[in-house]
């Protein structure tokens, strides 16, 4: 379906590689969390019940046993040093573990609130958000980053607060992004027919999962995104940015 004739009720956007550059996530956000996790844990270890819960959840993921097995001396107790090392281990391996995402979100929140961090969005994003809202569409976000972290990127973006444009946020609590059931869950949560949801992503596996659940999909080819194979280009609709989607309309 040509983008100029496309209709939808909800635009579901990915963040990394779609609204926001991959380099911002990998070269700014991840190192910030890695560099500040020890300080954050030291300040909140005793006082924050939320952090205590995250620490418990981190110890329950399969990778925790793998990590402790790599240590020269097995830890006698779980302390700041052990969890700091494990968090850095997960970040280095780019493992999308839910309690890690929650912890990163708390660390990033401090950075955004102090002005050390500002969320990157591509230049075409604000105009597209405005056009879709004016046309009566809802905008939702689905990212592997925690809902809290998603909101921070848009609230403290380089162009100001974009959070008011967004109606709903989904993270891995709804399911993994390359599983069809996740998108069925999202459609159910939104109360929409899957065919009325347009999902924008940079990952072919995510697009395939969404299509199998009945969603419309388009793949973004942003600067810095992983190049697509010829087969992936052939089997997906591709756009370079959001500019061709300004004419999105509600179904009649």
UniProtKB/Swiss-Prot annotation:
Which processes are annotated in GO (biological process)? L-methionine salvage from methylthioadenosine
Q: Which CDD domains does the UniProt record give?
A: HAD_EP (cd01629)
Positions of substrate binding: 143-144, 177
Name any cofactors this protein relies on. Mg(2+)
Q: Which cysteines are joined by disulfide bonds?
A: none
Q: Which reaction does it catalyse?
A: 5-methylsulfanyl-2,3-dioxopentyl phosphate + H2O = 1,2-dihydroxy-5-(methylsulfanyl)pent-1-en-3-one + phosphate
Free-text cofactor note: Binds 1 Mg(2+) ion per subunit.
Top-level class of the enzyme under EC nomenclature: hydrolase
User: Main localization of the protein?
Assistant: cytoplasm
An example of a Gene Ontology cellular component annotation for this protein is:
cytoplasm
Where does it live in the cell? Answer: Cytoplasm; Nucleus
Q: Pathway it acts in?
A: Amino-acid biosynthesis; L-methionine biosynthesis via salvage pathway; L-methionine from S-methyl-5-thio-alpha-D-ribose 1-phosphate: step 3/6; Amino-acid biosynthesis; L-methionine biosynthesis via salvage pathway; L-methionine from S-methyl-5-thio-alpha-D-ribose 1-phosphate: step 4/6
A GO term, aspect molecular function: acireductone synthase activity
Q: What's the EC number here?
A: 3.1.3.77
Is Nucleus included in the keywords of this UniProt record?
A: yes
Q: Does the keyword Ribosomal protein apply?
A: no
Q: Which SUPFAM superfamilies match?
A: HAD-like
Which terms are listed as keywords in the entry?
Amino-acid biosynthesis, Cytoplasm, Hydrolase, Magnesium, Metal-binding, Methionine biosynthesis, Nucleus
The record's section on InterPro entries has:
Enolase-ppase_E1 (IPR023943), ENOPH1_eukaryotes (IPR027511), HAD-like_sf (IPR036412), HAD-SF_hydro_IA (IPR006439), HAD_sf (IPR023214)
Report the sequence similarity comment from the record.
Answer: Belongs to the HAD-like hydrolase superfamily. MasA/MtnC family.
Q: What exactly does this protein do?
A: Bifunctional enzyme that catalyzes the enolization of 2,3-diketo-5-methylthiopentyl-1-phosphate (DK-MTP-1-P) into the intermediate 2-hydroxy-3-keto-5-methylthiopentenyl-1-phosphate (HK-MTPenyl-1-P), which is then dephosphorylated to form the acireductone 1,2-dihydroxy-3-keto-5-methylthiopentene (DHK-MTPene).
Subunit info here reads: Monomer.
What protein does this entry describe?
Answer: Enolase-phosphatase E1
């Amino acid at each position: 379906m040509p983008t100029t004739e496309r209709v939808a009720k909800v635009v579901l956007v990915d963040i990394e590689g779609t609204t926001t550059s991959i380099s911002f996530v990998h070269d700014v956000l991840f190192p910030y969390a890695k560099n500040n996790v020890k300080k954050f844990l030291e300040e909140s270890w005793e006082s924050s019940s939320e952090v205590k819960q995250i620490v418990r959840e981190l110890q329950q993921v399969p990778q925790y046993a793998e990590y402790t097995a790599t240590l020269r001396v097995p830890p006698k107790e779980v302390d700041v040093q052990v969890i700091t090392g494990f968090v850095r281990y997960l970040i280095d391996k780019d493992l999308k573990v839910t309690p890690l995402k929650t912890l990163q979100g708390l660390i990033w929140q401090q950075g955004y609130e102090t002005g050390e961090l500002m969320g990157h969005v591509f230049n075409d994003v604000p105009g597209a958000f405005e056009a879709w809202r004016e046309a009566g569409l809802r905008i939702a976000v689905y990212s592997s980053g925690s809902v809290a972290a998603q909101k921070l990127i848009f609230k403290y973006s380089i162009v100001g607060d974009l959070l008011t444009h967004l109606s709903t946020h989904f993270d891995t609590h709804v399911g993994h992004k390359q599983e069809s059931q996740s998108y069925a869950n999202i459609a159910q949560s939104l109360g929409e027919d899957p065919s009325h949801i347009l999902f924008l992503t940079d990952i072919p596996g995510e697009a395939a999962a969404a299509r199998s659940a009945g969603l419309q999909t388009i793949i973004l080819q942003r600067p810095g995104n992983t190049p697509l194979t010829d087969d992936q280009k052939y089997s997906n609709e591709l756009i370079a940015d959001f500019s061709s989607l300004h004419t999105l309309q509600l179904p009649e």
